[in-house]
Structures are given as structure tokens and as C-alpha cells.
């Protein structure tokens, strides 16, 4: 999938909407029958990605929430659990659509009271598992769906994954994906929920990264916390992604030494592989010393 303009290795599982399609001959139209995706169906699909060797991924993207808060929490926590067990990817999750929008179908509207939206987001996301291998955001953006010729609200967790992929492409994984430079949300008309400064501060203390529309700047990811619930170096996205990068590289180097003699020559060969890599990370501002 294309993430915020960049390609990434990811998995997105969501529901299926009823959509009107035109036949190839444009003679008639038909409506796709409903195929409600249950939480059990989604979890069964996610379970495939517990196999770290068979399915390498960088991001596990939640997509939309489910029909109820409990199911939304279950979906998010399953992704977080997989990412935490794999320890080589990041789960990107967010609130349910009903937390910030009212009405169902193709034309939901934002809730009038932003304090209610804030309370709803907190009620949902506070139940998400604490993990440095997950990122929570607050956003739903309004986009034009060119495939169905209509406007619709979609979650911004795929944009956050795209920001991380874009940061790796244009900078390095240990740079923060947030802010006016690297944290811009593309292809968005407006937000369903644009938190005030007081609301942003409240969300941020609860591990939720606000997605904010600033006049003259656009829509921006205005936070770089992981879903870790306590103070740690790993409560920042860039620190977790730095270690993902370093740990993966060192693991590959160590795997190449399997079944070799456990002697000075083997250890020296390992050091010769790892030291230049760490010096390169140091030169690019990832670490200060090693």
C-alpha cells in the first residue's frame, strides 16, 4: 500500500463497505453485498504475522476501529501484542471513528463538542496496552476518495506509518517523524477532530500523539511518543526506531557467525562487521558513543 506517498512493508486489515460498482461495459450497476468483518476474522488474519521469519513487516497498521469500543480495543491490542512479541516492527493504532464522528454510513459528521471527542478518545486509547512497539494518534482526516467519487473520513494511523517510512527514506530512522518538516499529513481537506492546546497537552500525557491542523502550515503530527505508559528512553518514537534499526543489523551480523568456532578470530570478525556500522550511525547523529 502507499503510505502518505511512500511505500512501506505493512499490513492493513479493516472492514468492507457496500459500494456501487460499474460493470466493465458501463451498461448497468450493481451493489456489492455486505461482508461484515468480525473481530475474530481480523485476529485470525493478524495471527499469520506472528511468524517473524515467514512474514517480515515494518508496520502493522490498525486502520479503522470496530463497531464497539470493546472490539476496537481488542483489535488495537492484538496488533500491539504482535509487534511487542516480534520486536522488529511498530503497531500504529488510533481511536474509533465513533469517538470523533456521529452518524453512520457514508456521511458521518464530527461531534460538535471537542471536549466530548477528547473524552471519547481517552476512554478508548487508555485501554490500549503499554508498549514501546506501538504508536497512538488522535486523527481522522477528510479526503476525496477518487475511486468512489466522494468525500469520506479515514483514520490517520496509516499516515503516521507513512511519516516513519518517509523519514527513513529522506533522513534516518532515528529522526522524529513528527513536526512541520517530517510530520505533514498529505491529501487531507480537514480533520474530524482538531484539538486545542489544552486538549493536546491532555492527550500527550496519555501517550496519544495529537494530529493538528495549524493555519498556514497544514495538518501535522504534533507528538512523537510511543505507547509506553511510563517514563523511559523508549517512550519516544525515534529512540525505538533507532534500536529497531541497530538491533536488526547486529542480529544479522551475529546470525552470519552461527556454527563458527568460538575463538578470537570469529569474535574479531564479528567486531569488524559491527563497528563500522555503529560508526556510521554515530556519524549520522543516531548515537553519541558505543
Predicted regions located by residue number:
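Structured, hydrophobic secondary-structure cores that serve as assembly/anchoring elements
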Residues: 2-290
